[in-house]
């Protein structure tokens, strides 16, 4: 068995550190985040909200167009919301409703959200952070879920992510992101759809 806490640029949510800890370490006040992920959960927001609430902005690109289900994968009815798919037990539905509202307020103020139009088209996962002229990035397999970030209390996904330690590569990654983000043939704005999903009574938080 390998020792824990190996010094490595790999973040696997196992022996080599977590993506969540990378984000908590690198995100600063007024950071500009660019993220590509197939999933977004309010519980991942809750797990690192102390950092996320201080950012300047987040550009979030869904790599899978089924974005409404991606907000909370595998939730199909009200009873499924008692315990989320990431293993985070919540006390009651009122607490879930409060998290959803806080997340919606944050999205309204600081987040732009787009989705690729074509299913099974964009597979990469990426987190780029720009803070006061300093760039940080990590890319690999981790989605923006509690388990994907390695922050689950009852087990996490083993992922394969690599910190990008070259300035040239970090700049190339951001250029690549911008090219897709600004291409209307590939992506569409879905922010209002996401906010509609999070807003009562349309959602399942009640």
Regions of interest found by a model, annotated:
Residues 1-206:
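PLD/PLD-like phosphodiesterase catalytic module centered on the HKD motif
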């Amino acid at each position: 068995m390998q020792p824990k806490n190996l010094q490595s640029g790999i973040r696997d949510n196992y022996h080599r550190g977590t993506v969540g800890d990378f984000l908590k370490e690198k995100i600063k006040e007024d950071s500009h985040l660019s993220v590509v992920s197939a999933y977004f959960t309010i519980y991942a927001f809750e797990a690192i909200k102390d950092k996320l609430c201080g950012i300047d902005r987040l550009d979030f690109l869904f790599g899978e167009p089924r974005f409404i289900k991606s907000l909370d994968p595998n939730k199909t009815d009200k009873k499924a919301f008692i315990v989320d798919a990431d293993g985070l037990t919540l006390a009651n539905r009122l607490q879930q409703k409060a998290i959803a509202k806080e997340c919606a307020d944050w999205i309204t103020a600081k987040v732009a959200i787009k989705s690729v139009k074509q299913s099974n088209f964009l597979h990469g996962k990426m987190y780029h952070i720009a803070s006061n002229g300093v760039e940080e990035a990590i890319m690999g397999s981790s989605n923006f879920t509690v388990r994907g970030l390695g922050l689950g209390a009852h087990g996490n996904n083993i992922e394969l992510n690599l910190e990008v330690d070259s300035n040239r590569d970090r700049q190339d990654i951001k250029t690549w992101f911008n090219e897709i983000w600004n291409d209307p043939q590939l992506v569409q704005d879905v922010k209002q759809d996401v906010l509609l999903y999070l807003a009562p009574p349309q959602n399942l938080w009640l």
